From Swiss-Prot:
Organism: Claviceps purpurea (strain 20.1) (Ergot fungus)
Primary role: Non-reducing polyketide synthase; part of the ergochrome gene cluster responsible for the typical purple-black color of the ergot sclerotia. The ergochrome gene cluster produces several ergot pigments including the yellow ergochrome secalonic acid and its derivatives, as well as the red anthraquinones endocrocin and clavorubin. The pathway begins with the synthesis of atrochrysone thioester by the polyketide synthase (PKS) CPUR_05437. The atrochrysone carboxyl ACP thioesterase CPUR_05436 then breaks the thioester bond and releases the atrochrysone carboxylic acid from CPUR_05437.
Ranges of Low complexity composition bias in the record: 1659-1676, 1713-1727
Residue span of region Disordered: 1659-1727
Organism phylogeny: Eukaryota, Fungi, Dikarya, Ascomycota, Pezizomycotina
InterPro entries on file: Ac_transferase_dom_sf, ACP-like_sf, Acyl_transferase_dom, Acyl_Trfase/lysoPLipase, Ketoacyl_synth_AS, Ketoacyl_synth_C, Ketoacyl_synth_N, Malonyl_transacylase_ACP-bd
UniProt protein name: Non-reducing polyketide synthase CPUR_05437
Boundaries of every PKS/mFAS DH domain copy: 1343-1653
Active site: C579 (for beta-ketoacyl synthase activity), H715 (for beta-ketoacyl synthase activity), H758 (for beta-ketoacyl synthase activity), H1375 (proton acceptor), D1564 (proton donor)
Modified residues (O-(pantetheine 4'-phosphoryl)serine): S1767
Length: 1808
């Protein structure tokens, strides 16, 4: 490395007197190797150790490359690893004892030495001059380590050179293994045997002679089997060889047997054996290793002393160096004495007088070297440094991570809604401390447990348990706060709603304010939530699918909604890993922070149970306990878990960001990870091995010793398998028997599920919050899961392992010597495991106090009710915490909380004063109005003139606010640079208040302090919209307006003052302020003689005037006016401005300004007291203006009045006086008495902070946005974030109640058969199909015969079908109207034909030739398919006859509810029978008539009178106007139409699907020509109307309709004479010149197109009209109300009729309810129209109805966004405006008119 580069010119005569020897030993340390590597790992995270981190990364990379090149049998011996440091872990002990032990230990030694070396030199650096002479040496693999140091020219090269050495060490170990295995194969079943022994024989020659004697005879012993002496020293030798041969040696040789010997830890094979290895061995190792290019080009810079010769290697490059060293390791004998002699010679040669030895652990060789050096040098001149000890000391407690991926993560906020009434973490902790089990019976708001419970498990879809752990009132929600309408809130999953609420509360606790700091930038915040079930969507929402079904129910909208509300632009993830979802989501959030994707995460888990299916399914899977208990974790009778609700949210940041942001840290995440139990016996079964592996992995990532963990929160569900497996994993990792915990280091374990049950997707979040509370409370709560005896499967040696299950509340205090560490386990039923390592939060000490005595405190809310609640909560908090710091409270309420529009603000100096003001606000809360409803007010700055301040000021802002002080100092530097004296003595308090400064200093101090004060207001976000300056204050005003620069301002003020001093006589003139109007002064001084002449200097108000003049004149006029009763006050000024005293300077001053100053166009209006007007242009303010302003009158009255006339200012303008005292604000209040707010920046005799705080409180109350963080920034390190009470929600219940027990049946036939018995829900009226089938008949339309009675020619058959059955639904889907699948009359026809064909042979067996005629079909109500395909939609058709031959069959169609309710018929028909041959004969005469009309139409086409349509054109027009047919229905190939007459060429599809008697698409294809004419002909007004058919007189087919066959259809529709909008016609179907079918008297009726949606809309899940069970009013869709909205009061929509009644549709019936919306009479005046039938009144009622709002909420200033009218609802309302009000608007309506008032005015203007 560069710091060690030897001086090339140094020799024996060098002045250097020091030699440094770096000795790399060949032994790993005897103490805890894992601890050394763990500390190096921790150091590598520090930004101060980049080279160490890179070396570890590079070494890991090369090892992975080398391992991938190994043979499969060797490669599989090495487990997967993330970093080479893992090889040192106890878990990898078998690796170090295995077949590859030599390679593994060699790598570990090199990595430890080089990593320690790098770390050491990143901590300390040598003085280059002291380290000119360096010698490197080592033993064994240590010698290889030295090569990296020798070759690296600079420190930055060492990681790459070191990685290459790691590669060679590994390859060397593998090579030696391969050779040694040939010498003697290892017994892998036992422990490895040593290949080398240290033998205490001093005479190495005698030892060699003994060996020669034993192995000298080549015939009796193979050369490769002989024992060699691999190392010699003065007192001993090392004998090496195959282990069995070594044992034989000690048995056979008396010399060796009698000598003391020790087996060395050399298990990898034989080295230092020239008889085994040749030069090619070393060369092959080096050549096979892919050396880094950088290393390959390096040359050795430091000498490495050979352990055989004692001389430095003679190598010219890296390859030669490596070959020399490896060859020596393989072939050469170690002669340590030679090394010692070589270093002695180096000392003698260099003349060194001192030696320093760096080493990596004590050894005999090191001792020999030390003794030798001390024999040459003076003992005191030899020093030894253990680099290993120095570099591996514990790292600093808090490191600075070198990247985000190495940061610790801080949890800074949390909030919850948990069972047992735990609506906050305090209540949660109370449950834990008291050891409560909060399980209870399933509450009624979820489902009726009485009907859904079966302890036997025999009844389908029922739960075998009645119990769970539930949140109280999960429907409570503050919808307006989150900008949600009641409709949206009701439809939104409570999991999402409560996630929003707890996210807000967690962020509130975290002191979050968006964009306050770098880590809170909105673009850098992400949301991560775990959710594993959709109960509310599946059951509650699913009963009435509405606009918000998708955004209110789909999981992605949960975190997405949080991002949207808070305007986070980072990622949002909804994560499902079953029971580990919550903690897995937090782990993903951690990864986002570590990967630098985000800077703040809001994460957690949610679970609200409303679906009984979940209980039933888990019971059937044997997951759940049946008892009235939460989870019986570790109990001998544990039989499953208890389900639980829960919502938990946390806010997480990187630790360094949290500390920089002054956050309260609840706990620190050191590591987190997730894996999968891949080798478990089943997917739901846990696996101890994988759990333990994950624990070790996460601990490694965190740099934590498992024995340092003192608490583990287990998953602990209370299942036999899960508890046992998890306990095994815990014991193996945290409380092993092999490396036991000390007596003072116990491990405690617990499981929160014993208290709260298993929250499934929120379980891990709950467990994490528990541990955070334990950190805070310094206690471990009792475990209550063991109800009786502990599970016998759990090992009995827990006490022996020092592992404890706390049965009582136990202390867990902070320790001074180490931090408390905890682990949270969370496992998923799908096999996922998540583990997190936590550390207690650091203690923050505040040494300095905030110097401010007065502080701004505010309480705010979005509504008045919440404001009252927030004030009350704060008062209660202060009563409970009397020592609360006002400074901290101000910081928390102003800089660290959201500021809402309903607010109160105050600036108390004492806690007593604060509580008094808070109580006063509660008493007058009705006087409080929301701030900023119409936007922030206009702000005006007014700048004070001279004479208002003390002669010497002492500004607290200058002392306390660095930015203010810096700005003043910059201005002062400019002033001094322009030749003026420093003005700081006039403001810093260094002189008494009455100390008189020069005019230059005084005037510069005033103007510069005003500029600095303005800059301070700017820094707080308060910028003026208009400015005005009084006299000298005009200069500061012009600067702030951008007219002149700060430099020019200082120049003009300073030069003018200098001119005054130079050219005007001090004391010759004076000024007086008179409490009189200008007119009064003139009247009372009109007789004054000429010697008493004076000038009107300032007109400050109606009765405030300032006069200037000579001293005598002012004395005289003052006397006169005082005698007249007017108060006169002489001003303490050096010169009389605005008088003739200034005349001598005017010309020169103007010339100077013209020559030196640049005037710019103002950036804001400037109110000019000189001109009495508002200046906007860039020409008025110039050199002449400042000349005139010096001499002429200041007319404040005219200036303000004219500004008001121009609307530049108004009574709502907020005035801030920028100056040393409140002067101008008093003028403004007198001139403009309607002004609401005029505030000072400073007061002459008051503390700066009191004045500023009072003004800020008033500004805040008025709605001015203030950068509160900037206000507190100079003092933030002295302030704490308080954990104040959470927001007081204005909650109401929004809930869709699950009704009935349809989850039990779901329309499945098996329920009726399998569920029969006691308590079965099945009955004879069940809508089940299969349960009651009495026939084998099954077609696509007639799916099940549920009743059949045949008696001669009399009979009844009842069929039942499910419209959702695929074939039937597809048939309906092929006939779409108004984007709904509608059952076409051809489907009814197929049903009729099928029943006729089924019954005829049963009732009249001899009627084989007869075919059916469907007569008098009348459909009174269309059958429209549900949108929800998952719910059955049943209908039945009954066919009855008393005499089939003479009376035919009577058919009725009826809808059937899922509970078996049968409705009134919606269609009827009659079937008769006839002979088709007779039909053909009777139709024959009509053929020529029909054919002639077809020919006539063809002719009309030819002359352009009639229209011809292609297939595509016809069906495209049909779809546009009414019916969108699917492909198989589109049989018309071409159409000719003229008026109401037309014919079509038809070809039926040849693609068959379904089981039909007469396929509906065939019937439609040949018959819907009539419908085409009625909805596409130019003879019909199809724009405003549409036509539908209620049926026909008769339909019959003499021949079957054949797939692929061609036909012709003809029809002429005739309007009826009564002008009722009814049309009749006969459709003829022809084939090959014959009429083969006919639809007689097909009828169409005309209806307004506006009613299309009303009559063709998908119904709810059960179509309800008047039923045959009982006579009840037809229920209709209820109007939702603001408060508790439930499905009970909102039945599904009626199935709309296909044929509307002739009279107008009846209005919707509104249900009677005690909490219905307020009537119009109760609405505010703004919503009351003189005529309630006006468009605007109707529009407001429509909006209120659609959003489920009360009319009283629709006040003029209410914003649609605040009311929850989002883009989706906007589209719905806009569409209803068009349909119901004929108001044509777009979806952007509520963006164009954002408030109720805006919309109402627009409607009244255009639609009145």
């Amino acid at each position: 490395m560069a710091i060690y580069t030897p001086n090339k010119s140094s020799d024996a005569n060098s002045e250097s007197s020091s030699l440094r020897v770096i000795f790399f030993g060949n032994e790993l340390p005897n103490d805890d190797l894992q601890t050394h590597f763990r500390r190096l790992h921790t150091r590598s995270k520090d930004k101060n150790h980049p080279l160490l981190a890179r070396f570890i990364d590079e070494a890991t990379l090369v090892l992975k490359e080398e391992i991938s090149a190994l043979s499969t049998d060797l490669g599989r011996l090495i487990p997967t690893f993330e970093t080479v440091l893992q090889w040192s872990e106890d878990a990898n002990a078998s690796l170090r004892e295995g077949l590859l032990c030599g390679a593994i230990d060699g790598v570990l030694l090199v990595v430890l030495q080089l990593a320690s070396y790098i770390c050491y030199h990143e901590i300390l650096t040598y003085d280059k001059e002291e380290c000119v002479h360096i010698a490197l040496t080592g033993l064994g693999i240590g010698l290889l380590s030295s090569t990296a140091v020798s070759l690296a020219p600079t420190p930055s090269h060492l990681p790459l050179a070191g990685a290459d050495v790691v590669r060679l060490a590994f390859r060397l170990g593998i090579h030696v293994l391969g050779v040694s295995e040939l010498l003697e194969a290892r017994d892998v079943s036992g422990k490895p045997a040593s290949w080398a022994y240290l033998v205490q024989i001093a005479d190495s020659d005698a030892a060699q002679a003994e060996l020669d004697l034993l192995y000298g005879n080549a015939e009796s012993s193979a050369n490769s089997n002989k024992i060699i002496i691999s190392a010699v020293s003065q007192t001993s030798i090392v004998a090496s060889g195959p282990p069995s041969r070594l044992k034989l040696l000690f048995n056979k040789s008396p010399l060796f047997r009698n000598a003391r010997s020790t087996a060395l830890p050399v298990f990898g094979g034989l080295c230092h054996a020239a008889h085994i290895y040749g030069e090619n061995d070393a060369r092959s190792i080096v050549e096979c290793a892919s050396l880094n290019t950088v290393t390959e080009n390096c040359t050795p810079l430091l000498p490495i002393y050979s352990t055989s010769t004692g001389n430095p290697y003679l190598a010219n490059n890296a390859t030669e160096t490596f070959e020399c060293v490896i060859s020596e390791l393989l072939r050469k004998q170690i002669c340590w004495d030679n090394v010692i002699n070589g270093i002695r010679e180096r000392i003698n040669y260099s003349g060194a007088s001192a030696a320093a030895v760096d080493h990596f652990g004590n050894s005999a060789s090191l001792h020999d070297l030390e003794v030798a050096l001390k024999s040459v040098l003076h003992e005191s001149q030899v020093t030894l440094t253990n680099i290993l000890t120095m570099s591996c000391v514990p790292p600093p407690k808090e490191i600075s991570p070198r990247s985000t991926g190495l940061s610790k993560l801080a949890i800074v906020g949390m909030a919850c809604r948990l069972p047992g009434g735990a609506t906050d973490t305090e209540k949660f902790w109370d449950i834990l401390v008291k050891g409560l089990d909060v399980s209870r019976k399933v509450p009624a708001d979820r489902f009726d447990i009485e009907t859904h419970y079966d302890p036997t498990g025999k009844q389908m879809n029922k739960s075998m348990t009645q119990y769970g752990c539930f949140i109280d009132e999960p429907g409570l929600f503050d919808a307006p706060f989150f900008n949600m309408s009641p409709r949206e809130a009701q439809t939104t999953d409570p999991q999402m709603r409560l996630a929003l609420v707890t996210a807000y509360e967690a962020l509130e606790q975290a002191g979050y304010v968006g964009n306050r700091t770098n880590s809170t930038k909105l673009e850098r915040i992400g949301t991560y939530y775990g959710q594993a079930a959709d109960d509310y969507r599946e059951v509650n929402q699913g009963q009435e699918v509405s606009t918000y079904y998708i955004p209110g129910g789909c999981r992605a909208f949960g975190p997405g909604r949080i991002n949207y509300f808070f305007k986070f632009a980072g990622p949002s993830y909804s994560i499902d890993t079953a029971c580990s979802s919550g903690l897995a989501a937090i782990e993903v959030a951690c990864q986002g922070l570590w990967n630098g994707v985000i800077d703040t995460a809001v994460a957690g888990g949610v679970n609200v149970l409303t679906n009984p299916d979940g209980f039933a399914g888990l019971c059937n899977g044997h997951f759940l306990t049946k008892g009235h208990n939460a989870c019986k974790t570790w109990d001998s009778t544990a039989d499953g878990y208890c389900r639980a609700d829960g919502i938990g949210s946390l806010v997480i940041k990187r630790l360094e960001d949290a500390e920089a942001d002054n956050d309260n840290i609840l706990g620190i995440i050191l590591g987190a990870g997730t894996n999968h139990s891949a080798e478990a016996v089943s997917i739901t079964h846990p696996h101890a091995g994988h759990q333990a592996y994950l624990s070790r992995q996460v601990l490694r990532q965190a740099g934590v010793d498992p024995l340092d963990v003192s608490y583990v929160e287990l998953h602990g569900t209370g299942t036999q398998a899960g508890d046992y497996e998890e306990m095994q994993g815990i014991l193996d990792v945290y409380a092993p028997l092999t490396k036991r915990r000390s007596a003072d280091n116990p491990l405690h374990i617990g499981a929160v599920k014993a208290n709260l049950g298993h929250g499934e997707s929120v379980a891990g979040t709950t467990a994490l919050m528990k541990v955070l509370l334990m950190f805070r409370e310094q206690a471990i709560p009792p475990h209550i899961g063991i109800k009786g005896e502990i599970n016998p499967k759990i090992p009995k040696d827990l006490a022996k392992r020092n592992l404890h299950i706390p049965m009582n509340l136990e202390s867990w205090r902070r320790r001074s010597d180490k931090k408390r560490l905890a682990v949270v386990n969370n496992f998923g039923a799908a096999g996922g495991n998540t583990t997190m390592v936590l550390e207690e939060a650091p203690i923050r000490c505040i040494e300095e106090m905030d110097p401010r005595q007065t502080h701004v405190i505010s309480v705010s809310a979005k509504t008045k009710n919440s404001l009252v609640g927030n004030i009350e909560r704060l008062i209660a908090y202060l009563d409970s915490n009397p020592d609360t710091s006002l400074a901290d409270l101000s910081y928390t309420t102003m800089a660290r909380r959201y500021q809402h529009s309903w607010r109160v603000a105050m600036a108390p100096s004492t806690m007593k004063d604060l509580k008094k003001q808070l109580s006063a606000y509660l008493e007058k809360i009705d006087l409080v109005k929301p701030a900023g409803k119409s936007g922030p007010p206009t702000v005006a700055f007014t700048f004070t003139g001279q004479g208002a301040s003390h002669k010497s000021m002492n500004l607290a802002l200058y002392h306390d606010v660095p930015s203010f002080r810096d700005y003043i100092q910059r201005l002062d530097a400019i002033a001094q640079g322009q030749g003026f004296p420093s003005f700081i003595p006039a403001i810093d308090g260094s002189h008494p208040q009455d100390h008189q400064h020069s005019a230059v200093v005084t005037q510069l101090a005033l103007v510069c302090s005003e500029m600095a004060m303005a800059q301070y207001w700017f820094s707080l976000g308060i910028k003026p919209d208009v400015v005005i300056g009084h006299s000298l204050g005009e200069y500061a005003a012009m600067h702030v307006a951008g007219v002149i620069s700060a430099s020019d301002t200082i120049f003009m003020v300073g030069r003018r003052a200098q001119l005054l001093q130079e050219k005007c006589k001090l004391g010759s003139h004076s000024m007086v302020a008179v409490r009189a109007s200008l007119e009064e002064i003139k009247q009372n001084t009109s007789s004054t003689d000429s010697d008493a002449e004076f000038t009107i200097a300032c007109i400050n108000g109606p009765t405030d005037t300032v006069l200037s003049g000579t001293k005598n004149a002012i004395d005289a006029v003052s006397k006169t006016l005082e005698q007249a009763g007017f108060r006169c006050t002489k001003l303490d000024v050096a010169f009389a401005f605005h008088s003739d005293q200034t005349d001598p300077i005017l010309d020169e001053f103007e010339d100077i300004v013209k020559a030196s100053v640049s005037f710019q166009e103002p950036k804001m209006p400037v109110i000019s007291p000189l001109l009495g007007k508002v200046v906007f242009d860039g020409k008025t303010l110039n050199a002449n203006y400042v000349r005139r302003a010096t001499r002429e009158t200041v007319d404040f009255i005219s200036a303000l009045h004219n500004a008001q006339k121009m609307s530049t200012i108004s009574e709502d303008t907020v005035w801030i006086e920028v100056g040393p005292h409140a002067v101008c604000t008093n003028m403004i209040k007198k001139i403009l008495p309607a002004t609401k707010l005029a505030l000072p920046s400073m007061r002459r005799d008051a503390d700066n902070w009191k004045t500023v705080s009072d003004s800020l409180a008033a500004l805040h109350s008025s709605g001015v946005e203030i950068f509160w963080n900037e206000f507190h920034r100079p003092f933030e390190r002295r302030l704490r974030l308080l954990d104040l009470p959470t927001y007081s929600w204005n909650n109401q219940t929004y809930w869709l109640q699950y009704q009935g027990d349809w989850c039990l049946t779901k329309g499945n036939g098996f329920y009726g058969t399998l569920g029969q018995g006691s308590g079965s829900a099945a009955s004879s009226s069940s809508p089940s199909l299969l349960a009651s089938s009495v026939s084998n008949l099954h077609t696509s339309t007639v799916q099940c015969i549920i009743e059949e009675t045949i008696d001669g020619t009399n009979g009844t058959v009842v069929m039942q079908s499910d419209l959702m059955q695929p074939d039937l639904y597809t048939a309906a889907e092929g006939h779409r109207m108004n984007d709904c699948a509608v059952v076409t009359s051809s489907i009814h026809a197929d049903i009729a034909f099928t029943l006729a064909e089924y019954m005829l042979p049963k009732l009249l067996p001899a009627s084989k030739k007869l075919k059916a005629i469907i007569q008098d079909l009348v459909v009174t109500k269309g059958l429209v398919a549900n949108h929800d395909r998952n719910s059955p939609q049943l209908f039945r058709v009954t066919a009855t006859t008393t005499d089939i031959l003479h009376h035919g069959l009577d058919l009725t169609w009826q809808n059937v509810d899922n509970d078996g309710t049968v409705h009134e018929p919606f269609a009827t028909a009659k079937i008769t029978f006839g002979d088709p041959e007779q039909w053909l004969s009777s139709w024959s005469p009509m053929v020529h008539l029909v054919q002639s009309r077809v020919e006539a139409l063809e002719a009309l086409v030819a002359d352009g009178t009639a229209n011809r349509f292609s297939r595509a054109m016809a069906y495209g027009l049909f779809a546009k106007n009414l019916v969108d047919y699917s492909e198989k229905y589109r049989g018309m190939q071409s159409v000719i139409m003229h008026g109401l007459e037309g014919f079509a060429n038809v070809r039926l599809t040849d693609k068959e699907s379904g089981n039909w008697t007469v396929p509906p698409h065939f019937i439609d294809s040949v018959a819907h020509l009539a419908g085409f004419i009625m909805n596409c002909s130019d003879a019909i007004n199809t724009v405003d109307n549409y036509c539908v058919t209620p049926g026909w007189k008769a339909m019959q087919f003499a021949k079957p309709l054949t797939p692929g066959a061609r036909y012709q259809s003809y029809v002429k529709m005739i309007p009826q004479a009564d002008n009722s909008g009814t049309y009749l016609g006969d459709v003829y179907i022809m084939q090959d010149g014959d009429i083969i079918g006919k639809v007689w008297g097909i009828e169409f009726r005309r209806y307004p197109r506006l009613l299309l949606s009303r009559f063709f809309s998908a119904p709810g899940k059960s179509s309800t009209t008047t039923t045959t069970k009982a006579s009840v009013s037809a229920p209709v869709k209820s109007k939702p109300v603001e408060t508790k909205l439930s499905a009970a009061s909102k039945p599904p929509t009626v199935a709309q009729t296909g044929i509307p009644p002739e009279q107008k549709p009846a209005p919707e019936v509104q249900p009677v309810t005690t909490n219905s919306p307020a009537t119009a009479a109760a609405a505010p005046a703004s919503t009351q129209a003189a005529d309630t039938d006006t468009v605007s009144a109707k529009a407001l009622r429509l909006i209120a109805n659609e959003a489920a709002l009360d009319l009283s909420q629709l006040e003029d200033d209410a914003g649609f966004a605040e009311l929850g009218i989002d883009s989706l609802m906007s589209l719905v309302i806009a569409e209803k405006f068009k349909i119901e009000l004929d108001v044509k608007v777009g979806g952007s309506l509520f963006l164009d008119y954002p408030t109720i008032g805006d919309l109402r005015k627009w409607l009244e203007e255009y639609y009145s």
